[in-house]
């Protein structure tokens, strides 16, 4: 986690120790990652990012994981932006692009979050995961777990 300052619960503000397993939180609360933006600005530039792999993991320095080599990946991310010309005209816009997240492994944008979350959980040694979902997230997390 090169640029992570800390992880804390959004509502309570309780900080989670680096490398620690994230304990359960109160309903409606969730862990939030805070970055060292000054160091990030001085170290990372657009060119460095473009040299990464053609996937979500090109942004690894910005993700809350220890090592990109630990990535649990099925090729998520790097989905195309497609022109939606007729809708653009109907909306009075010169150009309109739509992100085609259906090209992700499970057909949903949720693969991005599942890949990062499962990667971090594996880094922490978490071997059992319970995820409550009645939709796309369940399929995505099942693929990555």
Q: Which functions belong to the PLM regions below?
A:
Residues 1-145:
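PLP-dependent amino-acid enzyme catalytic core
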